[in-house]
Amino acid sequence: LIVRATCAKKDSFVPKKEAFWMEIPSEAVKEALVVAVPETAGSALYGMIDVLASAGKLWQELVGASPILEQISPKIVSPLSDSFVCGNNIPVIPDIKIADQPQAPIVILPELWLAPDEDLNGRYPDLMDWIRQCYQSGSSIYSACSGSIMLAETGLLDGCKATSH
């Protein structure tokens, strides 16, 4: 896979754009599993899917260049096998079920819509087990905003200082 990019030269008063080419191996494409449950904020879920799916492609589309292969392949993973609605009644159709034990190098826990006195204690035990298994298998686990509450529920933050907003 060949990617064309432009950069500005530092040695001139007025930056000149110079094209260069770099090769990106197709095996660099990474799958990212974004977790969805009914408490997930719909904007966070689909915002992440959109941003991750555009990685490595948006610039080519803007300048009319040939599209390149995707760099990140985001998929929605859920403990629920059927479609459901998440925060603000946004419909979700999971791509993958937790029961299928999917593996990926990246697992993301997006924002949750929880009341200030609400927690996830005892909810989704299979999901919590799966997140721990992914971590133990080498996956990078990321959380956004209140998704850190789900990360804390897994026990992976035990003994660590952590915060959410």
Language model segments and positions:
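Extended, subdomain-level signal for the structured scaffold at the beginning of enzyme domains
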Residues: L1-I141, M150-E153
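A conserved active-site-flanking secondary-structure segment within enzyme catalytic domains
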Residues: D158-H165
